[in-house]
Amino acid sequence: MILGIGSDFCDARRIEKSIERFGARFTERVFTPLERAKAERRARPAETYAKRFAAKEACAKALGTGIARGVFWRDMGVVNLPSGQPTLELTGGAAARLKEMVPEGYEPRIALSLTDEGPLSAAYVIISAELIGTPR
């Protein structure tokens, strides 16, 4: 069953301006250490950060909270499965909110799709619940 859907767009030029203006204060407030390490290895870190920023916004919308009510930026981190598929790892307030959303006897699933074209990035998040033991 679908519990929440969120989407967001982000312009890497906006992220780049925030990094120029605030530097590490911005990146450390918004992104997990893993996300920062990945972005800083890239030729165009702002584009990598923009995809992750869009994913966090989309996830916060799917959670039904936005970046509020105890859900903070670093509570949502984009990680890759061994297959390379992106997903979200939730901690803190985001994990607590996810737990509230999932009915007893079910387990959460988070689907994340990321795309970009030039400086523009988009993310789509679907939070669903499946009966415990349902094959993936």
Curated annotation (Swiss-Prot):
NCBIfam families: acpS, pantethn_trn. It is found in: Cytoplasm. Belongs to the P-Pant transferase superfamily. AcpS family. It comes from Azorhizobium caulinodans (strain ATCC 43989 / DSM 5975 / JCM 20966 / LMG 6465 / NBRC 14845 / NCIMB 13405 / ORS 571). The gene is acpS. It holds the Pfam family ACPS. Its main location: cytoplasm. Gene3D superfamilies: 4'-phosphopantetheinyl transferase domain. Its cofactor is Mg(2+). Keywords: Cytoplasm, Fatty acid biosynthesis, Fatty acid metabolism, Lipid biosynthesis, Lipid metabolism, Magnesium, Metal-binding, Transferase. InterPro entries: 4-PPantetheinyl_Trfase_dom (IPR008278), 4-PPantetheinyl_Trfase_dom_sf (IPR037143), ACPS (IPR002582), Ppantetheine-prot_Trfase_dom (IPR004568). One of its GO terms (biological process) is fatty acid biosynthetic process. Mg(2+) binds at D8, E57. Disulfide bonds: none annotated. GO terms for molecular function: holo-[acyl-carrier-protein] synthase activity; magnesium ion binding. It catalyses: apo-[ACP] + CoA = holo-[ACP] + adenosine 3',5'-bisphosphate + H(+). One of its GO terms (cellular component) is cytoplasm. Its EC number is 2.7.8.7. Transfers the 4'-phosphopantetheine moiety from coenzyme A to a Ser of acyl-carrier-protein. It comes from the Bacteria. This is Holo-[acyl-carrier-protein] synthase. The keyword Chloroplast does not apply.
